[in-house]
Amino acid sequence: MQITSAMKMVSAAKLRRAQDAITQMRPYAVKLQGMLANVSASLEQGEGQYSEVRDVKRVLIVAITSNRGLCGAFNNNVVKLATSAVKACEEANQAYAVLPLGKKALDAANRLEWPVAEGFGDASTTLFENLDFAHASEVANEVMAQFADGTYDRVVLAYNQFKNAAVQIP
């Protein structure tokens, strides 16, 4: 009984630390989002390489999940979102590839036999083992490079937005 109580206390402390980190980061994310919106609004349609309008022939679907389970619908919501994006591509006769980031997304891609995007190394399984800005930047830069060089005409992100410990918005 005491071991279970101690484990609950440790888990609660870890959860609180993670929540505090996310809460402290939220103002920066909001400010960054505002800055990006201003830059995007100031560009004329089709002016930048990332705002170019093109016929969508090939889509990259980036599915971001955790590496572990036991987190309720957290991973399932992302897989459902990615599945609906895959179905939309199939209905529109668009080629697609899935970039699974996180072990659960990779498992789903293998189980559902989705074509996995190439050129990202082992990011599917290693990104969240040692998550830092440099590693995440490498993946983001490769996604942007493949969009810029025309490998993909559209990029769809499937992820959860943190609201609180019990609720994540897909």
Model-derived segments and their meaning:
Residues 1-170:
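Conserved loop-to-helix interface motifs that mediate assembly, gating, or partner/ligand docking
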